[in-house]
Amino acid sequence: MANIKSAQKRILVINKKTARNRMIKSQLKTAIRRFEESLAAGNFEEAKTRLKLVEKKLHQAAAKGTIHKAKASRKVSRLATKLNKAI
């Protein structure tokens, strides 16, 4: 543990941010997995709605700084391409 008070505070803040980022990334992975499962099952209408949800979550994560803005856009683009190829 750090001895300096500001360093102790930074440790607490970093732990909170790490927990938040981990939670957001887990939600992203789950949303993407559900989209791909519905796509693999052939439920294209469900996949379209799930893609909208994934897009929303990705852009929210980018806005919070959890992932980079370009990474969010790239993932949305690739998932949309997957959906369009499957239809």
Swiss-Prot record:
Gene3D superfamilies: Ribosomal protein S20. Belongs to the bacterial ribosomal protein bS20 family. Binds directly to 16S ribosomal RNA. Pfam families: Ribosomal_S20p. GO terms for cellular component: cytosol; small ribosomal subunit. The keyword Nucleotide-binding does not apply. One of its GO terms (molecular function) is small ribosomal subunit rRNA binding. Keywords: Ribonucleoprotein, Ribosomal protein, RNA-binding, rRNA-binding. It comes from the Bacteria. This is Small ribosomal subunit protein bS20. It comes from Alkaliphilus oremlandii (strain OhILAs). InterPro entries: Ribosomal_bS20, Ribosomal_bS20_sf. The keyword Electron transport does not apply. GO terms for biological process: translation.
